[in-house]
Regions:
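N-terminal mitochondrial targeting presequence
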Residues: 2, 7-8, 13, 22-23, ...
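Eukaryotic intrinsically disordered, low-complexity regulatory segments enriched in serine/threonine
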Residues: 12-14, 44-50
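Residue-identity detector for glycine
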Residues: 14, 19, 35-37
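Intrinsic-disorder-associated, low-complexity terminal segments enriched in Asp/Asn/His/Tyr and depleted
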Residues: 23, 38-41, 58
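Low-complexity, intrinsically disordered Ser/Thr/Pro- and acidic-rich segments
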Residues: 36-38, 49-55
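Short glycine-/aliphatic-rich beta-strand segments at the starts of folded cytosolic domains
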Residues: 81-92
């Protein structure tokens, strides 16, 4: 059994160990839960796999930087019968032997690592990793799994150490805030209905009223999801009521909610809030970014999903998507193209977050595995 008193065994980067090929590289290949972007709350995430013979060695990069990158394969194909998939997200000061001790922790319980992604920045000795592994829950009960990874985190003074077992752990409980435009909201509801978003929707909150026969209201009623209409005014953003409704959720999604959340609400909530901005940040912040982009004569437009911080449209970016435009495009075609990008971008950011692919990196950045 792994304990905190165990001496952290060493692993020379660039050498192969137990089916994992470690090598030096500053590139980051490519999964998040809990407290990833909120400045008042820390985060989490998972990984992938492939045979060690397919992992190249980059000798030109100095050995202090490391990445273990194993190509993805379908998770269903990677989980033997009777076993479960586990995902581990890790952030700690860089040190020799982290991957070796991670492998030892899992292997000592009969588990098998299927993929590991590691990133160490060029200019900062911080170790980021996401791992996917399979294990037999009869041999490694969930509470023991949690305890072993807690010991691992203590061994390396980790800032983040999150382990998630999707088939055992509850789905993320979320609330969605939206305004008049509902293309992002309805897209999320449709993906949720299709089983493509691993979340439980606690409620939908809007500052725009929708009649009972509205397609969104009918969908919510059919699926038993509460809808709360909270009209806002400059002097009253209804944040007390919003806070009461979102308490108990794991994170909140702003699906084109056209109100600025105060710093007091962010502090009181204390968890991550994911926003979609209909522009390619950091350009075209604030209102009407499509018109700003059209007036600037850009050749690419985009959408940005990011964590909400007190500074408007300045939180760490999770996902961005772009599409080419030309002199033939009109302002209306900019808007139509942007809406398609917004739906995809927001859904992808939520999926990455739920799959433990996101970690905070410096003040305004993220590592997205």
């Amino acid at each position: 059994m792994f304990t905190t008193s165990s001496r952290c065994s060493s692993l020379k980067r660039g050498k192969k160990t137990e089916g994992i090929s470690a090598y030096s590289s500053s590139r980051c290949s490519s999964l998040p839960r809990n407290g990833i972007g909120n400045p008042y709350h820390p985060p989490t995430a998972p990984t992938q796999s492939e045979s060690e013979s397919e992992v190249p060695t980059h000798s030109s990069v100095r050995p202090s930087n490391a990445m273990v990158s194993l190509a993805r394969r379908p998770l269903s194909a990677a989980v033997p019968a009777g076993n479960l998939l586990g995902i581990h997200l890790f952030r700690c000061p860089d040190a020799v032997g982290i991957v070796a001790k991670l492998s030892e922790c899992i292997a000592s319980r009969g588990g098998n690592i299927h993929s590991v992604d590691v990133f160490v920045p060029d200019d900062k000795p911080v170790f980021y990793s996401r791992s996917e592994f399979t294990y037999n829950p009869r041999l490694w009960p969930r509470h023991e799994l949690h305890k072993d990874f807690l010991n691992l985190s203590r061994c390396f003074n980790a800032q983040t150490s999150t382990v998630r077992v999707p088939d055992l752990d509850p789905k993320y409980n979320i609330s969605i805030l939206a305004s008049k435009q509902d293309h992002c909201l309805f897209d999320l509801l449709y993906r949720w209905q299709e089983g493509r978003l691993p979340v439980h929707i606690n409620c939908v909150i809007s500052n725009h009223d929708r009649p009972q026969d509205n397609h969104v209201r009918r969908f919510l009623q059919r699926h038993g999801i509460p809808y709360h209409y909270l009209p806002t005014a400059p002097a009253n953003k209804r944040e007390k009521e919003i806070l009461e409704l979102i308490q108990g959720t794991d994170f909140v999604v702003l699906a084109r909610y056209m109100q600025i959340l105060s710093e007091n609400l962010l502090k009181a909530y204390g968890k991550d809030i994911i926003n979609i901005h209909h522009g390619l940040l950091p350009s075209f912040k604030g209102g009407n970014p499509s018109r700003q982009a059209f007036s600037a004569g850009v050749k690419l437009i985009g959408a940005t999903s990011h964590f909400v911080t007190p500074e408007l449209d300045a939180g760490p970016i999770i996902e961005q998507m772009v599409e080419r435009v030309s002199h033939r495009d009109t302002l209306q075609s900019f808007v139509v193209k942007s809406e398609n990008l917004e739906k995809q971008c927001l859904a992808e950011a939520i999926k990455s977050y739920c799959e433990l692919r996101v970690l905070p990196y410096e003040l305004r950045k993220t590592v997205v595995f």
